[in-house]
Structures are given as C-alpha cells and as structure tokens.
Amino acid sequence: MNINKFTQKSLAAVQGCEKLAYEYGNQQMEQEHLLVSLLTLEDSLILKLIAKMEIQPEMFTGEAEKLLEKLPKVSGGGQLYVSNDLNKVLVNAEDEAKAMGDEYVSVEHLFLAMVKQPGRAIKELFRLYNITRERFLQALSTVRGNQRGVSDNPD
C-alpha cells in the first residue's frame, strides 16, 4: 500500500480510523472505523452517494456508529493495530483506483473495496440497506461523470 497515492480526504478517513479506535477504546482499527470515518468526513462524498442510493444518511450513519460500540474494548491504551479485514480494504482500494483509471486512491475507492470485501458486521449492514457495488457505482457516476483522480485533492 502506497500512502503517497492516497488523496487528502482518503488520508483523513484513515486517520479518522485511529481517532475513532482511541475514542471507543478499541485496540484494533477495523472496517467499522473506516466506514464511520468516511461517513463523518467534512463534506462527505460517501454520505452524498448514500443519499443518492435513496438511503437516509443519518439513519445509516447511526447504524454504522452502533457497530463501533459492539467492538471489543481495552483499557490502558497501548499499541493500536490494523485488522486484517481493514488492511485488505486499504490494499484493494489501490486496485479499485487502478481499475477506474485513477492515479490516486480516493474515498470512493475505499468504500468500493469495503463493498467488495466486507467484514461480517459491515456485510450485514450493507445487505440490510441493499448497498451493492452496482448501486454505488451508479450513484457515483451521477456525481463523478468521467472525471479521473489525477491529483491528491480531487475529492
């Protein structure tokens, strides 16, 4: 994974994972942290795309936040780790960017990678809200058109 190929917003989302893990007392950063981070970014593209899929953004974000509360908690701080599931998403996001002809990994690539390989709780949430790759790409095409991500600040 080449962090230099992440847009400023996607880097902010990854940094948000760490912040959320600390806030919720989790030892591992999980896909749930990334999802909530993507949804709560300032001027969140993912939140706009969720709305375009005719899903109530506030309700979906609330459900995602409930998933954070279910994660194992530790006390006393210590080292923070990236889970295997989250690592797969971060690595696969680069593949998503390349497949779309983009030079940089953006928030939509992170979300698509999560749709492709969701952890158990995320998979259930996506099923509940009927979030599929096809629906997400359709919503994305209405916003993005045929633009390509060729800078680290296109979001």
Question: Residue ranges of each PLM-predicted region?
Answer:
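Histone-fold recognition with a strong bias for associated Lys/Arg-rich disordered tails
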Residues: 1-155
